[in-house]
C-alpha cells in the first residue's frame, strides 16, 4: 500500500493544491490518452460528483478530479433543451488554468523520472550485481566477459575495469529461463520471445561502437556461471532487474504528441499485445541514444492536449528550443551512421616544405658508417625488397598510410562526379591527381614495409556534401610486396580500387623505388573508369654528393569510354640544372589523336595549362596556403579500438622510438615484428594453410586484386541514408533498415505514421560491438498481433512513414528473396572463377591420361552377367 501511494503521488498529474474527490470504483477507467500516468477517472461525471459541478464538452477530454470545480447554478444553463450542459466562461478559465498546472506537473515528474534513470545508468554505485560470466557467441564458442546488472539493463564489458564496453542488453523485452547443459557450471538464457533484437545501439556513456569480440547473437544470449550458487544468484538478480525494467521505457521510447489519439504506449494495439510500434525515422537520428542529452530531451518530447492554436504554437516553439539545445552535443558534423567504426580527427599533420629543401638531406658520420656497411652487401641492379634498411631512413608510418596522401583533396572528385562536360571532368581528375604529391616528409625517408595481413583504414569528411570518403588498405602479399586499397564515397558518386607492387633497384650511387600497378577511378552515376599509373621515386647521392629524392617517369590517366587521356612526365633534375629544374613536370591532354591542352610547371608548386586555341597559359594547380587550408581532415580509428594488425597499433613501438631518436630501440622493435611475421609464415608452411587476405581477393582471370565488399551501384537518395564502415567492411544504411531497427526498439509514433505488425522485420545481423548492419534482412511476421485498422491498411508506403499495404509488403518480400538469390549466385560465380584455373589444369591432365576400357575390369563383366540374368528371368516371368 505504501508503494502504491508513493507511485500515485510520484506520477500524479494533479497540482499539489488540489484534493481528489471520492468516486465510485465501479465507474473508473484509465486515461489512455496521456502516456506516463495511470490515473483513474469516473466514466460518467455528474452523478458521482458534486451537484453543482458542470459537465465538460466531449472535445475537452475526460474530466479530472481537479477539473470538477464548483460553479453556482446561475452560471450554467441548458442548451436548446438538450441534456448537455454548457460550461460558463468562469469554469472554462478555471479548467484551462488547472490543465496548464497538470501539464507542468506532468513535465516535472517525467523529467525527474528521466534523471533517475540516467543516474541509475551512469552512477557506478547503482549496481544490482557485477561479476564475470561466460557468454556463448554465434560461432558456438565461449568468451569470458564482465557483466554489470543495473535496473532494466545488463551492461557487458570486456574487462572488470569497465572501460571497454561491448554491449547493452535491454531487459524490458527479454525473458529469462534456466538452460540445461552437460558442461560444468550453471547455464541460463536471456531471449526475446519474438526473436527480435535485445541490444541497444549506444552505451551508457554514448558509445556508438563496442569493443571487438567474437560475434554475439542478436535475439538471445546464453550465459554460464562458474557454479550453481553463482548462477542462482544471477537468476534472482535478473528477475529483480526485470521488475525494474519499466523505467527504461522512458529512455527507449520517443513518445509522440499526446494530442493525437493512439500515441500513448498503453493505448496502441501493439503495446497492448507486447509488440513495439514503429516511428518515423530521420536519417541522422540516433537509433537508441543512451546519453544524457537524449534522455533529457525525452522530458520535453511529450505534448499535452491542444486547447487553442496560440498555446499550441507557443509549446511547439519551446519544445524545439529545448530539443535543439540538448541534441547537438557530442555530434560530429555529418556523422553518417551511429553503428560504424569510431573515427577521430588527426590534429597534427606534417606537410613538409615546398621545393628542394625537404628533399635534400645530409647524412651524419654515424649513419654514413651504417650506410657503408649496408652498401658492401649490395650489387648494382640488385632488388632491395629483402634488404633490411637502417631505421634512420624510415618515415614513421606504414606504406599503406602513405598511399592515402592522394585523398586529402577528394572533394575535387566530388565535383568531377557531377560535372557534365567530359573534358572538364578530365581536368578535375588531373587536378586531383596532382594534389597528392606536395605532402612529403622532411628529409629522405622511406615508410615501413607493411607486414603481411596488415591493414589501414581512415576517412575524410566532406562538409560541402555531408559525406565521407573511406579508405581501406591491406597488405595482400609479402614476396612480392603487394598493397591493395579501396576508396569509396558512394554518396558523392566515386570509388577507386587498385594495387601497388613495390620494387626497388640499386644502381651504385642511386636507387629507385618502382610502384608497379594501377588504380581505377570509377564515377558510379556514369559508369566511367579512369585508369591511373604512378611515378617512381629516385634517390641519388648515396656514395658521393648530396643525397636527393625526386620523382620520375611517365604516367597516364586514361578513360576508354570518352576517349580522353592525360599524359604526364615527371622529370629528374639534370646534372647541370639549377634549383628551378627540380621537380619539373610536363604533359598534355588528348582526345584520340587531337591535343586539347599542354601542361608544364613543378609538381609540388605551380602547374600551368595552355589550351589549344588560347595564346596564354593559365594557372592549373598550386598548393598555396589557401589550398592547404582547404585540405579535408583525415579521421583515423582510435588506437585502443584498432586490431592487432592495423598499421598504427602494429608499428606504435617503432614509431615511438623513432620520434624519441632511439634508433637502437627502434631497430629492436622492428626486428621483433619481422621475426613474428617469419614465425607465422613457418607455421602456415608446416600446417599447409595458405595465406588468405581478409578484405581483398585476387581475380584468377585478370590477376587483379579487388575489394570483397565493393559496391558500384549509384547512390539512391530516396533509399540510401549513409555509407559506413565496420571492421573494414563498407556498407550502406538504408531507410528500410533504419525503420525496422527503430521498430524493434519500441518507439511509438503518431497513429497515422505507425506501421503494422507485418512491417516488423528482424535484421539479419544486429551485434552489440558495432558490427555493421547489412541492408538485406530476413522477414519475421508475428502472428499474435491485432489486426490493422482501416486507417493503417490504406495508403502508400513511405520509408519510415505510413504502413505498406499487403500488396506492397508481398512485393517487397518477393524482391527481397530475388535479391538474396542474386547475391548467392554472384558469390557462387566468384567461387567458380577462383578455382577456374585449377579446374582447367586438372582437366588437361585427365585428358592426357589413357581412358580405361569399359569391359577391361572383372567387376564390369560380373555386373554385365548379372544384368543379363535378370533380363532373362523377367522375360521368362512375363511369358
UniProtKB/Swiss-Prot annotation:
Coiled coil location: 93-123
Gene Ontology molecular function: cholesterol binding; oxysterol binding; phosphatidylinositol-4-phosphate binding; phosphatidylserine binding; phosphatidylserine transfer activity; phospholipid transporter activity
UniProt cross-references to SMART domains, sorted A to Z: PH
Stretches the record annotates as Disordered: 1-73, 254-341, 742-806
Segments crossing the lipid bilayer: 860-878
Species name: Homo sapiens (Human)
Entry keyword annotation includes Transmembrane: yes
Modified-residue entries (Phosphoserine), positions: 12, 747
PROSITE patterns: OSBP, PH_DOMAIN
Lineage of origin: Eukaryota, Metazoa, Chordata, Craniata, Vertebrata
Gene assigned in the entry: OSBPL5
Family according to the record: Belongs to the OSBP family.
Binding of a 1,2-diacyl-sn-glycero-3-phospho-L-serine, residues: 384-389, 449, 504
Location within or outside the cell: Endoplasmic reticulum membrane
Full protein name: Oxysterol-binding protein-related protein 5
Topology term for the membrane: Single-pass membrane protein
Keywords from the UniProt entry: Coiled coil, Endoplasmic reticulum, Lipid transport, Lipid-binding, Membrane, Phosphoprotein, Transmembrane, Transmembrane helix, Transport
Tissue: Ubiquitously expressed.
Comp. bias intervals (Polar residues): 766-783
Domain of life: Eukaryota
Record-annotated PH domain positions: 126-243
Compositional bias of kind Basic and acidic residues: 300-309, 316-325, 750-765
Function description: Lipid transporter involved in lipid countertransport between the endoplasmic reticulum and the plasma membrane: specifically exchanges phosphatidylserine with phosphatidylinositol 4-phosphate (PI4P), delivering phosphatidylserine to the plasma membrane in exchange for PI4P, which is degraded by the SAC1/SACM1L phosphatase in the endoplasmic reticulum. Binds phosphatidylserine and PI4P in a mutually exclusive manner. May cooperate with NPC1 to mediate the exit of cholesterol from endosomes/lysosomes. Binds 25-hydroxycholesterol and cholesterol.
UniProt-annotated binding residues for a 1,2-diacyl-sn-glycero-3-phospho-(1D-myo-inositol 4-phosphate): 384-389, 446-449, 478-479, 670, 674, 678
Amino acid at each position: 500500500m505504501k508503494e502504491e501511494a508513493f507511485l500515485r503521488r510520484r506520477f500524479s498529474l494533479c497540482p499539489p493544491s488540489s484534493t481528489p474527490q471520492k468516486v465510485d470504483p465501479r465507474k473508473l477507467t484509465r486515461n489512455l490518452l496521456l502516456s506516463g500516468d495511470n490515473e483513474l477517472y469516473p466514466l460518467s461525471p455528474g452523478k458521482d460528483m458534486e451537484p453543482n459541478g458542470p459537465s465538460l464538452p466531449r472535445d475537452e477530454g475526460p474530466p479530472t478530479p481537479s477539473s470538477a470545480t464548483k460553479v453556482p447554478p446561475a452560471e450554467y444553463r441548458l442548451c436548446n433543451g438538450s441534456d448537455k450542459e454548457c460550461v460558463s466562461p468562469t469554469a472554462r478559465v478555471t479548467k484551462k488554468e488547472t490543465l496548464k498546472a497538470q501539464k507542468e506537473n506532468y513535465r516535472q515528474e517525467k523529467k525527474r523520472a528521466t534523471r533517475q534513470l540516467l543516474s541509475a545508468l551512469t552512477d557506478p554505485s547503482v549496481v544490482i550485481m557485477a561479476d564475470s560470466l561466460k557468454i556463448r557467441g554465434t560461432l558456438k564458442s565461449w568468451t569470458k566477459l564482465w557483466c554489470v546488472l543495473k535496473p532494466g539493463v545488463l551492461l557487458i564489458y570486456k574487462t572488470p575495469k569497465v572501460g571497454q564496453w561491448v554491449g547493452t542488453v535491454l531487459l524490458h523485452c527479454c525473458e529469462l529461463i534456466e538452460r540445461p547443459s552437460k558442461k560444468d557450471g550453471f547455464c541460463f538464457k536471456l531471449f526475446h520471445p519474438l526473436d527480435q533484437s535485445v541490444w541497444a545501439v549506444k552505451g551508457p556513456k554514448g558509445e556508438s561502437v563496442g569493443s571487438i569480440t567474437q560475434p554475439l547473437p542478436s535475439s538471445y544470449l546464453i550465459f554460464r556461471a562458474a557454479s550453481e550458487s553463482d548462477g542462482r544468484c544471477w537468476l534472482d538478480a535478473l528477475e529483480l532487474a526485470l521488475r525494474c525494467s519499466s523505467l527504461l521505457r522512458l529512455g527507449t521510447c520517443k513518445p509522440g504528441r499526446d494530442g493525437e489519439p493512439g500515441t500513448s504506449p498503453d493505448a496502441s494495439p501493439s503495446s497492448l499485445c507486447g509488440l513495439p510500434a514503429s516511428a518515423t525515422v530521420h536519417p541522422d537520428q540516433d537509433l537508441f541514444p543512451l546519453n544524457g542529452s537524449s534522455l533529457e530531451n525525452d522530458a520535453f518530447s511529450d505534448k499535452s492536449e491542444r486547447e487553442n492554436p496560440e498555446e499550441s504554437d507557443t509549446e511547439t516553439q519551446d519544445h524545439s528550443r529545448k530539443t535543439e539545445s540538448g541534441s547537438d552535443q557530442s555530434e560530429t558534423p555529418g556523422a553518417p551512421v551511429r553503428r560504424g567504426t569510431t573515427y577521430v580527427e588527426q590534429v597534427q599533420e606534417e606537410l613538409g616544405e615546398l621545393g628542394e629543401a625537404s628533399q635534400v638531406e645530409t647524412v651524419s658520420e654515424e649513419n654514413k658508417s651504417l650506410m657503408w656497411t649496408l652498401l658492401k652487401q649490395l650489387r648494382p641492379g640488385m632488388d632491395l625488397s629483402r634488404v633490411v634498411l637502417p631505421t634512420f631512413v624510415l618515415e614513421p608510418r606504414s606504406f599503406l598510410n602513405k598511399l592515402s596522401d592522394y585523398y586529402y583533396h577528394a572533394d575535387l572528385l566530388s565535383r568531377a562526379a557531377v560535372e557534365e562536360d567530359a573534358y572538364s571532368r578530365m581536368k578535375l581528375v588531373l587536378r586531383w591527381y596532382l594534389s597528392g604529391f606536395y605532402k612529403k616528409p622532411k628529409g629522405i625517408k622511406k615508410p615501413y614495409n607493411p607486414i603481411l595481413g596488415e591493414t589501414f583504414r581512415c576517412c575524410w569528411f566532406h562538409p560541402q556534401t555531408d559525406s565521407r570518403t573511406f579508405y581501406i588498405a591491406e597488405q595482400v602479399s609479402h614476396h612480392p610486396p603487394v598493397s591493395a586499397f579501396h576508396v569509396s564515397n558512394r554518396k558523392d558518386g566515386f570509388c577507386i580500387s587498385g594495387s601497388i607492387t613495390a620494387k626497388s633497384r640499386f644502381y651504385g650511387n642511386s636507387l629507385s623505388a618502382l610502384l608497379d600497378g594501377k588504380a581505377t577511378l570509377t564515377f558510379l552515376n556514369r559508369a566511367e573508369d579512369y585508369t591511373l599509373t604512378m611515378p617512381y621515386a629516385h634517390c641519388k647521392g648515396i656514395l658521393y654528393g648530396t643525397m636527393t629524392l625526386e620523382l620520375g617517369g611517365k604516367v597516364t590517366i586514361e578513360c576508354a569510354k570518352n576517349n580522353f587521356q592525360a599524359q604526364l612526365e615527371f622529370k629528374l633534375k639534370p646534372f647541370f640544372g639549377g634549383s628551378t629544374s627540380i621537380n619539373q613536370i610536363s604533359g598534355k591532354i588528348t582526345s584520340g589523336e587531337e591535343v586539347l591542352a599542354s601542361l608544364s610547371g613543378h609538381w609540388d608548386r605551380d602547374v600551368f595549362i595552355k589550351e589549344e586555341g588560347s595564346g596564354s597559359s593559365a594557372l592549373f594547380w598550386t598548393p598555396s596556403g589557401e589550398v592547404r587550408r582547404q585540405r579535408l581532415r583525415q579521421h583515423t580509428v582510435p588506437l585502443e579500438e584498432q586490431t592487432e594488425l592495423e598499421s598504427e597499433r602494429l608499428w606504435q613501438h617503432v614509431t615511438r622510438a623513432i620520434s624519441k631518436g632511439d634508433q637502437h630501440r627502434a631497430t629492436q622493435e622492428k626486428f621483433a615484428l619481422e621475426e613474428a611475421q617469419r614465425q607465422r609464415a613457418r607455421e602456415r608452411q608446416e600446417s599447409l594453410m595458405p595465406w588468405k587476405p581478409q578484405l581483398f581477393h585476387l581475380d584468377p582471370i585478370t590477376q587483379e586484386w579487388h575489394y570483397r565488399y565493393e559496391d558500384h551501384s549509384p547512390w539512391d537518395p530516396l533509399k540510401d541514408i549513409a555509407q559506413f564502415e565496420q571492421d573494414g567492411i563498407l556498407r550502406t544504411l538504408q531507410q528500410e533498415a533504419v525503420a525496422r531497427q527503430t521498430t524493434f526498439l519500441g518507439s511509438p509514433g503518431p497513429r497515422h505514421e505507425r506501421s503494422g505488425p507485418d512491417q516488423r522485420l528482424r535484421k539479419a545481423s544486429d551485434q552489440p560491438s558495432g558490427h555493421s548492419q547489412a541492408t538485406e534482412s530476413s522477414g519475421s511476421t508475428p502472428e499474435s498481433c491485432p489486426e490493422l485498422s482501416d486507417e493503417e491498411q490504406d495508403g502508400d508506403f513511405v520509408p519510415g512513414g505510413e504502413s505498406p499495404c499487403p500488396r506492397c509488403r508481398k512485393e517487397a518480400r518477393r524482391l527481397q528473396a530475388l535479391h538474396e538469390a542474386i547475391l548467392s549466385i554472384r558469390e557462387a560465380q566468384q567461387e567458380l572463377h577462383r578455382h577456374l584455373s585449377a579446374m582447367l589444369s586438372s582437366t588437361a591432365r585427365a585428358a592426357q591420361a589413357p581412358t580405361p576400357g569399359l569391359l577391361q575390369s572383372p567387376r564390369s563383366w560380373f555386373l554385365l552377367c548379372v544384368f543379363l540374368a535378370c533380363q532373362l528371368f523377367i522375360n521368362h516371368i512375363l511369358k
